[in-house]
């Protein structure tokens, strides 16, 4: 599966680029799970994931405020839930690297594909209705 087959455009170059970066991190996690990596290598990718996802959510929430998106509070709660889910996996599976990478990969892929298709598409629809008439 390629990035362009599944990810919608947010009409925002920064957010679109970040979605692509998160997709690349997801690919790294998937490969790490197949290769049975050590904790040192995993920590590097986990750090990259947490930094990128927090930055992306912050930027996306700023975009929603900028366009006056009426459901920003709901969307922000979903973001917090995703972050908590990732953190919970890291804590609960710290001793089992392969299980951790597998679970994280599923959460990240779910976020990238399902969240963008379902939730982010609502932002896109609102943006297009409000600004692209």
UniProtKB/Swiss-Prot annotation:
The protein's name in its UniProt record: Bacteriohemerythrin
Function: Oxygen-binding protein. May be involved in a storage mechanism or for delivery to oxygen-requiring enzymes. The oxygen-binding site contains two iron atoms.
Gene3D superfamilies: Hemerythrin-like
InterPro entries: Bacteriohemerythrin-like, Haemerythrin_Fe_BS, Hemerythrin, Hemerythrin-like, Hemerythrin-like_sf, Hemerythrin_metal-bd
Binding site for Fe cation 2: 60, 75, 79, 115, 120
Oligomer and partners: Monomer.
Keyword Acetylation: no
Residues the entry annotates as binding Fe cation 1: 19, 56, 60, 120
One GO MF term: oxygen carrier activity
Keyword DNA-binding carried by entry: no
UniProt keyword annotations, A-Z: Iron, Metal-binding, Oxygen transport, Transport
Stated family: Belongs to the hemerythrin family.
Any Pfam family: Hemerythrin
